[in-house]
Swiss-Prot record:
Residues 430-592 form the Helicase C-terminal domain. It comes from the Bacteria. It is found in: Cytoplasm. The lineage of its organism: Bacteria, Pseudomonadati, Pseudomonadota, Alphaproteobacteria, Rickettsiales. GO terms for molecular function: ATP binding; ATP hydrolysis activity; DNA binding; excinuclease ABC activity; helicase activity. It comes from Rickettsia bellii (strain RML369-C). The gene is uvrB. Residues 25-182 form the Helicase ATP-binding domain. The UvrABC repair system catalyzes the recognition and processing of DNA lesions. A damage recognition complex composed of 2 UvrA and 2 UvrB subunits scans DNA for abnormalities. Upon binding of the UvrA(2)B(2) complex to a putative damaged site, the DNA wraps around one UvrB monomer. DNA wrap is dependent on ATP binding by UvrB and probably causes local melting of the DNA helix, facilitating insertion of UvrB beta-hairpin between the DNA strands. Then UvrB probes one DNA strand for the presence of a lesion. Belongs to the UvrB family. Forms a heterotetramer with UvrA during the search for lesions. Interacts with UvrC in an incision complex. InterPro entries: Helicase/UvrB_N (IPR006935), Helicase_ATP-bd (IPR014001), Helicase_C-like (IPR001650), P-loop_NTPase (IPR027417), UVR_dom (IPR001943), UVR_dom_sf (IPR036876), UvrB (IPR004807), UvrB_inter (IPR041471). ATP binds at G38, I39, T40, G41, S42, G43, K44, T45. Residues 621-656 form the UVR domain. GO terms for biological process: nucleotide-excision repair; SOS response. This is UvrABC system protein B.
Length: 661
């Protein structure tokens, strides 16, 4: 059994050793929930990594969005290069769920675009969980959505060992049942091909490796891992386990049993709708379901097969669907990052999904069993989760109630940096005062972050500062991902001195060059000026040894009072620690990983082409598909050097797209 092994030049420092010991002590004492209160720059990810290494338990880390999940995944991948660090998020680049609008009698068909790279990584994650223990899966909250049953998924695997006999026709049939496609010309992920005594399989969890099964009659002589592009043999394998090309693969008997149960439910639903004199709905549900049943009978699958998942998994009506949590071992560990945001998201997901599907069921577009194709209810998630460590700088009531108010604090930073000094100034004439503060901050070589309450005010302030010849940019939700990354890069490199935003200057925005955070209209109580929002925004100045925060307010609100009191409490603890050990705070100039990814793409494509590609997901996906076809064509023409060059470019784009998604 492999153990977790951290590869890093750093050792736990500051509050990290104490926090690691306390969390591990709680885990050993069977505490179900613990709270790790980690402030900005305290090294929460490195602390989590050390807890994982010392407990040596399979781990799931949940983040509240794909971007944060990608950041954590990249960091964990670099900390644990010898272990299985996996990424599990929604594989849709674009997703429009099916819906019906009764008021206008409009039915919207399901429309989606699947990201092949993320689909591959999802398969890699479930495979790792089933085959090994040194696994870290970094996931978004979408992991609470239904997934194929782990029992069926594993039951459907094809296990191969050299020296054993496998009737070739049966093997090929098994591959088809696993939803692999025979393609003797275009060999890509999820395909197999037959050449003489060889069967080549491109597993669902690989992008650059395939397996060659060499037979003598029905006896499997060798299994070679090879490069599907060049045909070069890489290594000989002692065994191979082929997993399904979908998490919803099912044995024929299960499909037949499900068909029978779907027909039974259909007849009950038809009888009910007729009793309500809903003739249109009766005709609609009969026509749609009969078509799905025909497809299931002929192919073992159908469009929207997930809506019948209850029958395939053997669950009863109302029971929770199988999710990623059922793939976890019983002794797994769960970290919920930025839990003050993640937990409310988990709580909200079920109700939104339910409301849409109830309309579909009521109007004859789906059977009632479709309601069981859903995310977990919050109570179900709470019941399923293993021993959990919530991680946040601003824990909410749920986490504090779960831990009995006990908190393990990460307040002292390894760098010795203090929480920023907070100054309150009158909101009257706040813009004029801000201009003076901006001037003095820029003179020191630092940049400025300004947060406003409304989009209109942010736009007006940006225009005003630009008229005064300040290099200013505006960060808002309509900006494409690449442009956002470019703005942050320009800010850090000094091309921009001031960044104005509304609610985008909070979690995950780490800019060591920031010398001032200005919060306009700080006394306007509400979501954007709550205690949590203020503490998170104040934290943006905590990566600079000279960082300051100015709150413009005409009155002291409860949120301001609590936020400043908490910041000063932390600052006092940090100052005392620094004085005791003679530590001098020093700004750490840390590169933003996503910027490095962007530069990798820039090095292979010109800036104009890069910007055009990342303007929208459709352009990027089309270009990646085009590159893949060119690569395969070059390989088939035996132009291996050109094919390898295209493969490198393709891999770079896919990795960057993942970071920037």
């Amino acid at each position: 059994m492999s153990n977790f092994s951290i590869i890093s030049d750093y050792k736990p420092a500051g509050d990290q050793p104490k926090a690691i010991d306390e969390i591990i002590k709680g885990l050993n004492n069977k505490k179900r929930s613990q709270m790790l209160l980690g402030i900005t720059g305290s090294g929460k990810t490195f602390t989590m990594a050390n807890i994982i290494e010392r407990t040596n338990r399979p781990t799931l880390i949940m983040a509240h969005n794909k971007t944060l999940a990608a950041q954590i995944y990249s960091e964990m991948k670099s900390i644990f290069p010898k272990n299985a660090v996996e990424y599990f998020v929604s594989y849709y680049d674009y997703y429009q769920p099916e819906a019906y609008i009764p008021k206008t009698d409009v039915f919207i068909e399901k429309d989606s675009s699947i990201n092949e790279q993320i689909d591959l990584m999802r398969h890699s994650a479930t495979r790792s969980l089933l085959e090994r223990r040194d696994v870290i899966v970094v996931s978004s909250v979408s992991c609470i959505y239904g997934l194929g049953s782990p029992d069926l998924y594993y039951q459907m695997t094809v296990n191969l060992e050299p020296g054993k006999s496998y009737p070739r026709d049966k093997l090929l049939n098994d591959l088809v049942n696993l939803q692999y496609e025979r393609n003797d010309i275009g060999f890509e992920r999820g395909c197999f091909r037959v050449k003489g005594d060889n069967v080549d399989v491109f597993p669902s969890h690989y992008s650059d490796k395939a397996w060659r099964l060499s037979f003598f009659g029905n006896e499997l002589e060798y299994i070679h891992e090879f490069d599907p592009l060049t045909g070069e043999k890489l290594v000989k394998l002692d065994k191979a386990i082929i997993y399904g090309n979908s998490h919803f693969v099912m044995p024929k008997e299960t499909v037949n049993k499900a068909i029978s149960e779907i027909e039974e439910e259909l007849q009950k639903r038809i009888a009910f709708l007729k009793s309500q004199d809903k003739l249109l709905e009766t005709q609609r549900i009969n026509q749609r379901t009969q078509y799905d049943l025909e497809m299931l009978t002929e192919t073992g699958s159908c469009k929207g097969v997930e809506n019948y998942s209850r029958f395939f998994t053997g669950r009863k009506a109302g029971e929770p669907p199988p999710t990623l949590f059922e793939y976890l071992p019983k002794d797994a560990l769960l970290f919920v990052d930025e839990s003050h945001v993640s937990v409310p998201q988990i709580r909200a997901m079920y109700n939104g999904d339910r409301a849409r599907k109830e309309v579909l069921v009521e109007h004859g577009f789906r059977l009632p069993s479709a309601l069981d194709n859903r995310p977990l209810k919050f109570e179900e998630w709470d019941n399923f989760r293993p021993q959990t460590v919530f991680v946040s700088a601003t824990p909410s009531l749920f986490e504090l109630n779960e831990t009995g108010g006990e908190v393990v604090e990460l307040i002292i930073r390894p760098t010795g940096l203090l929480d920023p000094e907070c100054i309150i100034k009158p909101a009257t004439n706040q813009v004029e005062d801000l201009v003076g503060e901006i001037q003095s901050t820029i003179a020191k070589g630092f940049c400025v972050l300004v947060t406003t309450l409304t989009k209109k005010m942010a736009e007006d302030l940006t225009n005003y500062l630009q008229e005064l010849k300040y290099k200013t940019s505006y960060l808002h939700s309509n900006i494409h991902t690449l442009e956002r990354i470019e703005i942050l890069r320009d800010l850090r490199q000094g091309t921009i001195d001031i960044l104005v935003g509304i609610n985008l200057l909070r979690e995950g925005l780490d800019i060591p060059e920031c010398g001032l955070v200005a919060i306009l209209d700080a006394d306007k109580e509400g979501f954007l000026r709550s205690e949590v929002s203020l503490i998170q925004t104040i934290g943006r100045a905590a990566r600079n040894s000279e960082g300051r925060v100015i709150l413009y307010a005409d009155k002291m609100t409860k949120s301001i009072d609590k936020a400043i009191s908490e910041t000063m409490r932390r600052r006092t603890i940090q100052q005392e620690h620094n004085e005791k050990y003679g530590i001098i705070p020093k700004t750490i100039n840390r590169t933003i990983h996503a910027l490095a990814e962007l530069e990798k793409v820039d090095s292979k494509l010109d800036k104009k082409q890069t910007h055009n590609l990342f303007e929208n997901p459709a352009k990027l996906k089309a270009h990646i598909d085009k590159l893949r076809k060119e690569m395969l064509k070059a390989a088939s023409n035996l132009e291996f050097e050109q094919a390898a060059k295209l493969r490198d470019q393709l891999k770079t784009l896919e990795e960057a797209a993942l970071e920037l998604s």
